[in-house]
Amino acid sequence: MAAITEMATDSNDVINDGGTGDGIEKSTDSKPEIESDDLKPKSKPEYDQMKKLVAMFKKLNPEAKEFFPSYKRNTNQSDDFVIAIKPSGEDNKKVAINRRRRNNYNQGRRVRLPGRASKAQREDSIRRTVYVSDIDQSVTEEGLAGLFSSCGQVVDCRICGDPNSVLRFAFVEFSDDQGARSALSLGGTMIGYYPVRVLPSKTAILPVNPTFLPRSEDEREMCSRTIYCTNVDKNATEDDVNTFFQSACGEVTRLRLLGDQVHSTRIAFVEFAMAESAVAALNCSGIVLGSQPIRVSPSKTPVRSRITRSPSPN
């Protein structure tokens, strides 16, 4: 083949004569100086045909797509190792992959199930919760839960103070969404002096840390005399909050003001001597204390005394 290629040199090839240093074009039709009998073409047409074949082969690209076997994969493996996969095998592989996906098989990757699970639980809690507005201030959470218990099992009831109205609103959560749907029929029911409105809730009830809940009958009685106040001016002191509620509602027996450097406002727990004072304090929602309108709602937790640590012996 090398001999044939040498014979079929293109007519435009330049051959150096080695003497003058000038390039002299030499036609391929001229015969080489030394030519064996085996390389001599039998006829000129046969020679021309051979030359065309050699020229054609020289233009071919062995790596072209049409000359690359379909069963050979483009991998980092060496060229002498070829993996042959039948079309049916490829189809079976796709079926196996889909089956693993359906079975939540995710080798080498972390499946974030806890986040998805918590989102699903939150959405389920929203479906089981209704929003109740225009609640009279004389209505307690126990009384409201008793009213809605006719629709299904009530698992949580939270009354909150509305800063824009003397009336309050609440969230009632049921054990299933059927109870929440049934509760919608209670819209317009008179509770106290006002008919309440009942709508599907757009939020779930924020859970309370169980360690903060009342642990005894005495602490439950304390909760009935305690309010939870938010949006308190950051510059307000405990004396400011105490003076505000004592002059407007009644005697304050205990107060806890909490805040940090991150949030722009603070929160407060205020315990009164009488439960009636705590009910009256709910009317203070929307009143400006310092430079912020406060929001007041019944407290779910009592104000516990701070634990004082005795100095360690030397």
Curated annotation (Swiss-Prot):
Q: Compositional bias of type Basic and acidic residues: which residue ranges?
A: 23-47
InterPro entries found in the cross-reference section: CID8-like_RRM1, CID8-like_RRM2, Nucleotide-bd_a/b_plait_sf, PAM2_motif, RBD_domain_sf, RRM_dom
The UniProt annotation puts motif Bipartite nuclear localization signal at 99-112
Q: Where is this region: Disordered?
A: 1-47
What keywords are assigned to this protein? Nucleus, Repeat, RNA-binding
Gene3D superfamilies, per the entry: 3.30.70.330
Which Pfam families does UniProt cross-reference here?
A: PAM2, RRM_1
Subcellular localization? Nucleus
The residue numbers the entry assigns to motif PAM2-like are 59-69
Tissues expressing the protein: Expressed in cauline leaves, stems, rosette leaves, immature siliques and primary inflorescences but at a low level.
Q: What is known of its domains?
A: Contains a PAM2-like motif, which seems to be involved in the binding to the PABC/CTC domain of PAB proteins.
Q: What is this protein called?
A: Polyadenylate-binding protein-interacting protein 8
Q: Which organism is it from?
A: Arabidopsis thaliana
Its taxonomic path starts at:
Eukaryota, Viridiplantae, Streptophyta, Embryophyta, Tracheophyta
Question: Which gene is annotated as encoding this protein in its UniProt record?
Answer: CID8
